[in-house]
Amino acid sequence: PSGQDGIVGSRPERYPMERDFGGIYTPGVTVFRQNEAKGYGLLAEPFKVGLVTVAAINHPQCVDPTHMTPDCVQGTLNKLRTVLRLALRAGHDSLVLGAFGCGVYDNPATQMAQLFRQVFDEAEFKNKFRLVTFAVLDNGKTTPRNPVGLYQAFANVFGRRD
């Protein structure tokens, strides 16, 4: 094997997740810029965060515009569990999550929010996090897979808190 397969594939002890649903935890990433609304200016006091990286399914197969096939649902659930497991193993009690593939990867947003809710309600994860925030833009954009928009899809499932 060559490339990443040669590194990751031969080192399963470093990446204990299933290969198809694996993820990477990166501790101590320095945040030193402000947000877009502030022109990405430099922060007066940079801070560090831990990052969990798990790839969402790219353009999943769907049984209708807003629902993935059972295989894609199961794969997505496994990926969401990986995100939460990595965060817990690293000792985090607060999360900032994105819409997990509901943008250019075209995952159905309402179903994705429901799948997040389902995983957070599982015994392994229920009440394990002090704070969970979804960083989902309210840009008003809708698509056939996201007829209410990303923000509204997540707000409908989790409620809105500013």
Where are these regions (language model features)?
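Macrodomain-like recognition of ADP-ribose-binding/processing modules
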Residues: 1-95, 99-162
